[in-house]
Amino acid sequence: MYLEVKNLKKSYGKDQSYIQVLKGVNTSVKKGQMCVIQGTSGSGKSTLLNCIGGLDEMDSGSVTVDGQEIFGLKPAQLSDYRRDNLGFIFQFYNLVPNLTVRENIRVCEYLTDDPLDMDELLETLGLTEHQNKFPSQLSGGQQQRCAIARALIKNPKLLLCDEPTGALDSKTSRDILVLLEKINAKYGTTMLIVTHNNSIKNMVHKVIFLKDGLVIKDYENETRVPAAELEDL
């Protein structure tokens, strides 16, 4: 397996404010799979993603990505792990306002010795004609495309997406999902997508469902629907 999570536990606070968010999560994802993580609010979806991404320190358990165990890594080692392996896409874009689209993407291009081709990536994401614009000149969907390009330019092995369409309308959400599907097919990028949208589970290879900090469903999707045909986005 490319990603393996074993008995992962994570809590916050102490004494009366103590809450255990992840209570022993076990799951795995194959290389090149698109995987959706779903569950009710407070079930631990984003916390799981953050632990896998090294953004949050787990209490105990094991997370292995491409054979590398990340539990117990020192801060400098975690930084190297994120730089060498991961790309992040969040609900809000955090683009640098005084940099153009191309310049925003280039910020992350310098983090690797093996970046994707900039012009090819811009074309794939439909940003070629917008590459010299500033974020304030872009629509919400175009800004999210820029954020996706910025995450992808360093050719990550694993793309972590936390509500990537949460702030977008239905049409734009579908367009972004079509792009993620296209990127997965073209580059073979393994993806974990946290979302509240129930329809997205129909387009991915694997579905993980959390409830109260535990995995209650974990299955591979045998009847995938193309993102362009998804309803109720």
List each language-model region with its residue ranges.
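ABC family nucleotide-binding domain
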Residues: 2-3, 8-203, 209-210, 215
